[in-house]
Amino acid sequence: MSVVLHISDTHFGTEQPRVVEALVALAAQQRPDVVVLSGDITQRARPAQFRAAKAFVDRLGAPVVAVPGNHDIALFDLWARLTRPYARYARAFGSDLEPVHAAPDLLVVGVNTTRAWRHKHGEVSAEQIDRVASLLTAASAQQLRVVVVHQPAAVTRAEDHVNLLRGHQAALRAWSAAGADLVLGGHIHLPYTLAQHGLARRLWVVQAGTAVSSRIRLEAPNSVNILRWGEASGARDDPARTGTEAGASCLIEQWDFARHEHAFVRTAVTAVDPERA
């Protein structure tokens, strides 16, 4: 079984130390195989904020697949924004803005949806859509196929439509046809799992809240997701289940920070059955 810790919008510079420590403790307890960090790692893309973020992820004890968010490009330093927008990010997290993590039962594909000429809105190009689709097509049936973006590919509330990833419809159509199971994102600090219908095959958009920042929504505390993929993850012996090889399932767990307990606690579990031919 593979365990993925999905965190987002850490916004270092606004982090809460006790929440940071609670998340480090959760990672030590759950021992993820990989950590996915879906952007807005810093608040203002300052070198000290990137250093603090890197020190934090180094404590999580697993390989990290990170993509930048709009906050990870300098906002007020226009020269840096226009000439070397990702230089500070690269010093901390490497120059590969679209990393790929491949294991026998897991494929994670990062997509850089930020643009230096945009303030906060994200987009995915036709070239990026095709690159991801090619990687998905080559994946094995045993692999959970995960795409990571920053801005959401689907939303649950009308007020969040303005934050939708530009090009999301074309991306979801192509990635579904190519075999994607999950599209992970952040940006709006609101956690949810949303099934996508009317596509070539089943696909779920999985959003994470803000992991450790004080910039929380009133209705959404600090939260992260834990994904469990494999036969053992479901613990469900239902002979009527169809559409998966050997009953493989994926559990998507939402873990919220409980202030009275000073710890992350599991608050929701969504079981999904990725389709396999």
What do these predicted ranges mean?
Residues 1-5, 99-110, 140-144, 198-204:
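Beta-strand-turn-beta hairpins that frame and shape the catalytic cleft
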Residues 6-8, 35-40, 64-70, 112, ...:
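Active-site neighborhood of phospho(di)ester-bond hydrolases with catalytic His/Asp-centered motifs
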Residues 160-241:
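Conserved beta-sheet core of the metallophosphoesterase superfamily
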Residues 13-15, 43-48, 70-81, 115-120, ...:
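Active-site environment of divalent metal-dependent phosphoester hydrolases
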Residues 1-59, 75-76, 131, 137:
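N-terminal active-site segment of His-dependent metallophosphoesterases
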Residues 141-156:
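Short acidic, glycine-rich surface-loop motifs adjacent to enzyme active sites
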Residues 229-277:
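A short C-terminal boundary segment appended to hydrolase-like catalytic domains
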Residues 51-131, 174-176, 199, 226:
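Extended active-site neighborhood of metal-dependent phosphoesterases/phosphodiesterases
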